[in-house]
């Protein structure tokens, strides 16, 4: 296993798929990274030389990934809550934030049904 950005990246997978195991790197960004360092996206990580691995590390260092990205997201949500915005209120109440209906559906966000005893 190769360690990139604090994550053990699987070396038996294609470069794009392996890079997607890093939080904050999706398919399109992984393809962009492979293209910029000149690696075929179907090359397995284990077959890459140390030079290309270092190039990959340097390219990924340009982006906000892993712990920094998680911290940034939680701070953004905390800021919304502290400001008292509508979105912050929805986050605090564990309800959908982006205008989805809540009379029916929204079970993932609201959690399991609460039983009402009559």
Curated annotation (Swiss-Prot):
InterPro entries with a match to the protein in the record: Rbsml_uS13_C (IPR027437), Ribosomal_uS13 (IPR001892), Ribosomal_uS13-like_H2TH (IPR010979), Ribosomal_uS13_bac-type (IPR019980), Ribosomal_uS13_CS (IPR018269)
Pfam families xref list: Ribosomal_S13 (PF00416)
Record-annotated membrane-spanning stretches: none
GO molecular function annotations of the record: rRNA binding; structural constituent of ribosome; tRNA binding
Span list, region Disordered: 95-118
UniProt cross-references to PROSITE patterns, sorted A to Z: RIBOSOMAL_S13_1 (PS00646), RIBOSOMAL_S13_2 (PS50159)
A Gene Ontology term for the protein's cellular component: small ribosomal subunit
Biological process according to GO: translation
Record's keyword terms, sorted: Ribonucleoprotein, Ribosomal protein, RNA-binding, rRNA-binding, tRNA-binding
Residue stretches in coiled coil: none
Described purpose of this protein according to its UniProt entry: Located at the top of the head of the 30S subunit, it contacts several helices of the 16S rRNA. In the 70S ribosome it contacts the 23S rRNA (bridge B1a) and protein L5 of the 50S subunit (bridge B1b), connecting the 2 subunits; these bridges are implicated in subunit movement. Contacts the tRNAs in the A and P-sites.
Subunit structure: Part of the 30S ribosomal subunit. Forms a loose heterodimer with protein S19. Forms two bridges to the 50S subunit in the 70S ribosome.
The family this protein is said to belong to: Belongs to the universal ribosomal protein uS13 family.
Protein name: Small ribosomal subunit protein uS13
Source organism: Blochmanniella floridana
Organism classification: Bacteria, Pseudomonadati, Pseudomonadota, Gammaproteobacteria, Enterobacterales
Gene that this sequence comes from: rpsM
